[in-house]
Structures are given as C-alpha cells and as structure tokens.
Amino acid sequence: MRRRSKKIKTENNSNPETSEERNKFDEIPHDLVIEILERLPLKSVARFLTVSKLWATTIRSPDFRKSYRGGSSSEPRTLIVSDLNFKEPNPKLHFFRPSISSPSFLSSLTCPFTYPRHEEYYYHHVNGLISVGYGTDQIVINPTTGKFITLPRPKTRRKLVISFFGYDSVSDQYKVLCMTERLRGHPEEASSQHQVYTLGAKQKSWKMINCSIPHRPWSWNAVCINGVVYYIAKTGEGMFRRCLMRFDLKSDNLDLCTILPEEIQTSLHDYFLINYKGKVAIPNQPNFYTYDVWVMNQEGGKIEWLKNITFTIKPRKGFVRYLFVTGTTHTGEFILAPTSYTDEFYVFHYNPDMNSFRKIRVQAPGVKFSFAQKASVVFSDHSLLRLDNLHIRGSTHTATGEFILAPRFYSDDLNVIHFNPDTNSFRSTKVEVYEDYE
C-alpha cells in the first residue's frame, strides 16, 4: 500500500502590527534618536539595543559613546583607582565613579603582579579602558566590570619597560606603546626597543618600530587626543632638554612634537599632561596653591604654548594641603585630587568660568578608607559606556525572556550578561568550558 506523506501546514504567527510598529522606530530621524538616547540612563540604553539593527549600530558607534553622559550632562565622569600599595605583591585595585547624587563603586580586582623594587607601575586611561604596565607585564582593564586581559610580554631582556596607551576612534583600535631603559646609573642614555601592540589584532605579538629622535620619557602619564598619544620626554645632549613626543596610532609613527617653553623647563614640579578642550595642556605649579595651565596651540601649522589660565586655591577648611590637576571634565572643569588619602577621599572640581570650586566625596559600599596615606590615581572624563563590546548572541533571549549579551573577546574567564526587560536589571553568568576553545 502506498502511503501518502503527511504535509504539515505552518502558519506565520508574526504580528503584522508589531512589525509595522518596529518599522516606525527606524523612521524616527537619526538626530532625534541620538537626542533621546543621550538622555537615558545606561540600563535603558542597553535595552534599546534590541529595538533594531539601526539603533544597535547607533548605540555602538564611537560618536555616540563619546557624547553619551549617562543621562546627565552635569554628572562628573571621573574615575578613581585607589589602594595602590606598591610595596606589596598582587595589589588590590578599587575603581570608583564619584557622583553628585550617589557616588558609586564600580569594581575591584587583584593585579597579577609581584613587586621587585626596580620596577614601577604605569597607569593610562583612554576611552573607558585602563592599561597597567609593570616591567614586562602589561594588562588592560575594564574598570566597569573589573575584568582584564594579559598582553604578551614585549621582546626584551631588560626589566625596566615604560608603556603608554592610546585609542584611535577612526579605526576603533587600542594600542600600547612601550620602550625599554637600562635599570639604573645611565640617566643620559636614550630609551630603545620601541614596540607597539594592537588589541584585537589577528597577530597577537609586539611590533618593533623605528624612532629617529633619541629621547628618554620624563613623565609617567600621557594624553591621547584624536588618535595621537603625547608624552613628555628628555632629549638633546645629555638628555637635559624637555620636549613633547607624539605617537600617531594610524601610522605607528613616533617623533618629536615640540620643545617645552622655558617657564616649564625650569619647573621643579612633576609634569602632568591633560586634555583641555581638545588640546594638549600642562598644569604647572609655581607654588603649593597656584596653578598655571599652559595650552599647546597648533592652528595654522605653527606650534606655540599659551598660558591660558592661572588660578589659586586659598587654604580653607575641608581642603587638603596639596592637590594636583589630574584632568578636565567634559564641561570644562579642572579636576584636582590628592595623591593619597586618609580616612576619607575627595576630589575637587574647579570651574574657571565661575571661579568656583565644588567638593565631591567618594564612597563605596564595603570598602573603607581607614588606612593612612593610601595611594590613588584619578582619571578624568571616564567613559562608562562600553556597549560596543556586548552583542546579542544565539536565539537573542532565554526561555524566561531575558536577552543574552556576550563580549567579542575574553581572557581566562568567559561571562555573559542577561538583561531582564521587565525588571530593567542585569545579571552576570560565568560560562564553564571543559575543552580548549579559541
């Protein structure tokens, strides 16, 4: 007997009205979409990743990440790294984000480093990530999650490695620049073995680059503006002339930018580079309470240094004795912070237009500022939004309706994020893998 095959009729259960409503989202003018998203808190922005591909692309774009303020244009975006006990192995790092309304604790992590006395830490912050260089060990940290990746060791036998960190928004690439020096006793000798590591590149190794300018880094910090990393160095005969070096992330070119003005050459204070309204600036301190801000102007192809701002902090109640200018906010305020703290920790914002100060206290649940003279590092203009590294995976949601978001890259641990649109909440889930994976 011949059997007939049973045909199963399938029906399209998609709701045409729902599809039409979703299409209406894409009809909203792009500028209006940006304006709406910029006024929303982070969790709401993450929720709108699921509206459409156009909205997801917009949210992950570098321009939106740069302009996003977390729902408030007046909210400070300072990032503070504290509890840096360099004299102990495997120091614990705490990341804080001070806020006018509710100061927040972001994360903590234990650095996988020991502490030989001849090595130093180098911290650099750019576009929401932090690089920490410690001798030949280099890691890159996401302070929002407390996760980090370990980079391969540079190609060198030397122990003293100085590193800098940069980001190019055009190519959406992070790069680490490092160079080596002899351990001690050779202050007049230039650095050598200049190498570059590109995060996310297929070739996970350091690339040697040429530098025709003999120089030796003088300041531990750097500033990255428009895909160029700037740092202060010594050059010339005997390494006595102080200059500004620049590293172009697009071309991997390292060269001399300009010589520092004489007023800064003779300063006895440490140099600290900041980004002031898109320009390289150096806050100089003639004395404990006075600050001169020198800004580098490159208009017309000619480089000149202008002393744009001078302000003084009068000793007053509630101010610690010695503050450093560590950066500026997106609203143009200068961030002043101590290098250490005791029972409490504060940062200060100075508004040059209003000639006014405001004091922001840093608090963290479960973390006490109870030990005297703990070291700290304060980064300005921290970008908390790193949604470009999260993507909806698999069937996009769980059986309970939660959306699954996973990172593009991982190191030792693999975690996925579950977002519940009903409760507007996130939870992190560690994925256990029992075989090798790439």
UniProtKB/Swiss-Prot annotation:
Region (Disordered): 1-24
InterPro entries reported for this sequence: F-box-assoc_dom_typ3, F-box-assoc_interact_dom, F-box-like_dom_sf, F-box_dom, Gal_Oxase/kelch_b-propeller
Domain F-box residues, every copy: 22-68
Superkingdom of the organism of origin: Eukaryota
Disulfide bridge map: none
BP-aspect Gene Ontology terms: defense response by callose deposition
PANTHER family from the UniProt entry: BNAA05G37150D PROTEIN-RELATED, F-BOX DOMAIN-CONTAINING PROTEIN
Name by which UniProt lists this protein: Putative F-box protein At5g15660
Native species: Arabidopsis thaliana (Mouse-ear cress)
